[in-house]
C-alpha cells in the first residue's frame, strides 16, 4: 500500500512537471488586415514584448479584408475567448466602439494603436508619432525634391482610417505656410489593397498630366504607386513618397522611382502596444496625465484624450535604405 502511495505521488509530480506552463495574461494584437508587412513587423515586436514579460501570450489576429465589419467579428471572437486585453489598429474609429465597449464591460482592457478608436471605445491610444509632425513630414518628403513646386496627390488607405485621415488633415494645414508652392490636387483611397491602390495610382496619373509626386501614407499604397511609376516609365517625372517599410521599398529607392520615404519602427510600435496593454492588465490607470510603461521604449504620458505618441518618423533614402531593409 505504501509503495502504491509513493508511486502515485511520483506520478502526480511527473504529470505536474510535464504539464505546459500556460501564460497568465493573453493580449490580442488586432490588425487592420493580415498579410500586411507593416503589421507582420509589429507582431515581431509584440512577441518580443511577450518574451520579455515572461507571463504573457500575444494572440496575433485580424481580418483578411481591411473593413470594420470584419474587425467586429474578430473582436466578438476574442470576447468569447475571454482574453485579458485587446490592442487594436482600427479600420474605423466609430464602428468598432459598441463591440469594444462590450469587451470593456466584460473586464477586457482595450487600447488602440497606430489607427485609433474613438475615446469611448478604448482606454488609451498609442500614436506611432505626433500627428502634425507626420502630416508635415509626408508633404516635406515631396517638397524637398520639388524646388519649383508643383502638383501632388495623396493615395491613402481607406476613407475611414483614423490615422491616415488625421495625417492628411495635418498635411493640408501645413501647405499654406510651410509649402505654399505645393498644390494638392486630389486625395484618393486604395483601401490598403494592392490592386485597388494600383488602379488609383494609374487614375491619378491619367487625370493630372502635370502631377509631380504621389504621396502615400500607407505601406501598401506607396509600393503600388512606385510600381506603377516604374512600369509606366515615369521615373524622374513622378516621384513617389510617403510611409514605407524599407524591406518592401528598397527596390524603388534603388531604381529612382522614389527619392525618400519615412516611417517609424513598426517592431517598436507592436512592442510598445503590448507593454501598454500589459500595464493596464496589471493595474495601471489610463487617465489624462498618467504615465505608463513602454518597456525599452520608455514611458508614455497621456494627453487629455488619453493618447500619446511613441517617436518621431525616420527618413529612408539612398544613404541608409540598404541598412534598414535588413531590419524591417
Locate the predicted segments by residue:
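Flexible loop/hinge segments that line or gate small-molecule binding clefts
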Residues: 93-133, 140-144, 151, 246-259
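Hinge/cleft segment of the Venus flytrap/periplasmic-binding protein
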Residues: 159-163, 181, 276-328
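Sec/Tat signal peptide C-region and signal peptidase I cleavage site
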Residues: 17-23
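Hydrophobic alpha-helical segments within soluble ligand-binding/sensing domains
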Residues: 71, 126-152, 166, 194-198, ...
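Hydrophobic alpha-helical
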Residues: 85-104, 171, 190-252
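Short, solvent-exposed amphipathic alpha-helices that sit
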Residues: 38-52, 134-138, 162-182, 196, ...
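Short beta-strand elements in bilobed, periplasmic/extracellular small-molecule ligand-binding domains
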Residues: 52-64, 151-154, 177-192
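Extracytoplasmic "Venus flytrap"
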Residues: 26-49, 53, 59-73, 83, ...
Amino acid at each position: 500500500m505504501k509503495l502504491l502511495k509513493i508511486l502515485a505521488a511520483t506520478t502526480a509530480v511527473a504529470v505536474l512537471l510535464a504539464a505546459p506552463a500556460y501564460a497568465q495574461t493573453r493580449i490580442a494584437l488586432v490588425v487592420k488586415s493580415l498579410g500586411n508587412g507593416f503589421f507582420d513587423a509589429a507582431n515581431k515586436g509584440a512577441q518580443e514584448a511577450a518574451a520579455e514579460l515572461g507571463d504573457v501570450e500575444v494572440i496575433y489576429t485580424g481580418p483578411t479584408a481591411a473593413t470594420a465589419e470584419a474587425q467586429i467579428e474578430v473582436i466578438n471572437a476574442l470576447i468569447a475567448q475571454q482574453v485579458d486585453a485587446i490592442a487594436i489598429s482600427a479600420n474605423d474609429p466609430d464602428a468598432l466602439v459598441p463591440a469594444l465597449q462590450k469587451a470593456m464591460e466584460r473586464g477586457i482592457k482595450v487600447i488602440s494603436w497606430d489607427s485609433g478608436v474613438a475615446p469611448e471605445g478604448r482606454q488609451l491610444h498609442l500614436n506611432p508619432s505626433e500627428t502634425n509632425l507626420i502630416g508635415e513630414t509626408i508633404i516635406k518628403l515631396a517638397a524637398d525634391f520639388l524646388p519649383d513646386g508643383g502638383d501632388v496627390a495623396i493615395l491613402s488607405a481607406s476613407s475611414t482610417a483614423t490615422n491616415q485621415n488625421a495625417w492628411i488633415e495635418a498635411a493640408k494645414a501645413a501647405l499654406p505656410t510651410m509649402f505654399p508652392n505645393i498644390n494638392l490636387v486630389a486625395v484618393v483611397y486604395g483601401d490598403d489593397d494592392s490592386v485597388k491602390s494600383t488602379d488609383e495610382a494609374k487614375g491619378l496619373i491619367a487625370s493630372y498630366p502635370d502631377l509631380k509626386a504621389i504621396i502615400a501614407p500607407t505601406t501598401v499604397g506607396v509600393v503600388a504607386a512606385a510600381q506603377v511609376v516604374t512600369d509606366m516609365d515615369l521615373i524622374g517625372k513622378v516621384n513617389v513618397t510617403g510611409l514605407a517599410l524599407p524591406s518592401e521599398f528598397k527596390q524603388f529607392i534603388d531604381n529612382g522611382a522614389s527619392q525618400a520615404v519615412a516611417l517609424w519602427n513598426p517592431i517598436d510600435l507592436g512592442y510598445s502596444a503590448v507593454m501598454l496593454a500589459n500595464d493596464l492588465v496589471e493595474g495601471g490607470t489610463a487617465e489624462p496625465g498618467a504615465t505608463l510603461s513602454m518597456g525599452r521604449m520608455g514611458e508614455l504620458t497621456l494627453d487629455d484624450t488619453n493618447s500619446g505618441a511613441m517617436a518621431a518618423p525616420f527618413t529612408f533614402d539612398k544613404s541608409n535604405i540598404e541598412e534598414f531593409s535588413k531590419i524591417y
